[in-house]
């Protein structure tokens, strides 16, 4: 059995943003837990794994220790450190100010020495130095936050400077790749450098494309970026996983169709890329060739509204999709041809936003 930890939104989200009249999300108490049979695809809920965590939007596991990190989407932003016990049970060890507003993403370097946190509110990028038990020794700014806080609607990104939506460490541990929806850019900084390091690269995107998430091809020569604002999958030339320039753009939905891409995830075999499409209520399925070039193959209905979380299971047999506005998680079986086909019934989970596989 595989423990699936689900980052969700909590009620305090609506202290910072105007809640639309049409919103149907249910607030969680923190991090939810599911149990997945990765052989059959059977999924069952197992309640709250950790409460009192403020809108843990994205989760990251330590590479060598049973420790989970959660980016707390609040003002000020925080990073929560949780011990992972038997059966996926979580015990919160600490919640530390992450030196920015609205912590939106967290990632841990391959050596397990540093957790990096990106902030949506003010564009701050911070480094949390870890001890031998995975605890946070000190938090240091990498790039201080300079932008004005967000107000009003959640998607009002423009006009006030950097707003980071994701940070990824390159697989070799050498670079920090950040997706900046506020400046329509993807910037790579050297990992382990001091404050305000000179970027290794900066790739500009079309205005209001809102580059949201980054994924790496295993060859190290290609990276993928999904634009939330223009529903486009960008294919980038990369050098040792560092994105350097756009080489192709693939519209994910037909012209005239509204979609807000969310998360993208490359299958472990490197041959299929999955992208969640909010408002279109579908998952885009793209074929990937040996060189990393992609081709849009089609769409599979997400069996719910506004798929925000998309993640392939550790075995590569199943795709989990979190439908935010339906408050459900759906399992899809991934066939030999790479196409996801729905299994079973949707499982109720309040406002699912991200997945982490704890075992």
Describe the residue ranges of each PLM region.
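Short, conserved, GDST-rich strand-edge loop motifs in beta-rich repeat architectures
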Residues: 2-26
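Short loop/turn segments immediately following the C-termini of beta-strands
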Residues: 9-11, 73-75, 120, 130, ...
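Beta-rich, blade/repeat-based domains predominating
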Residues: 15, 52-64, 99-111, 146-172, ...
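Short loop/turn segments immediately following beta-strands, especially the blade-tip
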Residues: 34-41, 81-89, 127-138, 189-196, ...
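A short beta-strand motif characteristic of beta-propeller blades
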Residues: 44-51, 91-97, 140, 151-157, ...
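Blade-loop segments of beta-propeller domains
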Residues: 44-112
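Blade-level signature of beta-propeller repeat domains, shared across WD40, Kelch, NHL, RCC1
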Residues: 324-328, 341-359
């Amino acid at each position: 059995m595989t423990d699936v930890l689900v980052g969700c939104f909590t009620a305090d989200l609506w202290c910072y943003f105007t809640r639309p009249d049409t919103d149907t999300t249910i607030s969680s108490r923190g991090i939810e837990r599911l149990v997945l049979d990765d052989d059959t695809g059977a999924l069952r809920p197992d309640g709250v794994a950790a409460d009192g965590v403020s809108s843990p939007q994205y989760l990251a596991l330590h590479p060598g220790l049973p420790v989970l990190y959660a980016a707390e989407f609040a003002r000020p932003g925080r990073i929560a450190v949780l011990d992972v016990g038997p059966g996926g049970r979580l015990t919160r060890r600490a919640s530390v100010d992450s030196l920015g507003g609205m912590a939106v993403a967290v990632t841990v370097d391959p050596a397990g020495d540093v957790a990096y946190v990106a902030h949506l509110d003010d564009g701050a990028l911070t480094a949390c130095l870890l001890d031998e038990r995975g605890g946070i020794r000190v938090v240091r700014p990498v790039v201080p936050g300079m932008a004005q806080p967000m107000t009003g609607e959640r998607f009002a990104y423009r006009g006030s400077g950097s707003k980071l939506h994701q940070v990824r460490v390159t697989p070799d541990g050498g670079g920090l790749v950040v997706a900046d929806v506020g400046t329509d850019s993807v910037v790579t900084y050297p990992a382990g450098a001091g404050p305000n390091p000179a970027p290794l690269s900066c790739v500009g995107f079309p205005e209001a494309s809102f580059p949201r998430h980054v994924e790496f091809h295993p060859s190290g020569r290609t990276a993928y970026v999904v634009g939330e604002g223009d529903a486009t999958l960008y294919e980038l030339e990369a050098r040792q996983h560092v994105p350097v320039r756009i080489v192709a753009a693939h519209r994910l939905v037909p012209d005239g169709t509204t979609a807000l891409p969310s998360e993208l995830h490359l299958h472990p075999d490197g041959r299929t890329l999955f992208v969640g499409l909010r408002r279109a209520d579908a998952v885009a399925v793209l074929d990937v060739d040996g060189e990393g070039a992609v081709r849009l193959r089609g769409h599979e209905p997400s069996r719910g509204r506004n798929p925000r979380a998309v993640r392939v299971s550790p075995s590569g047999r199943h795709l989990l999709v979190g439908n935010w506005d339906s408050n459900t998680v759906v399992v899809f079986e991934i066939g030999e041809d790479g196409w996801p086909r729905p299994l079973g019934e949707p499982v109720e989970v309040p406002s699912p936003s991200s997945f982490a596989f704890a075992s």
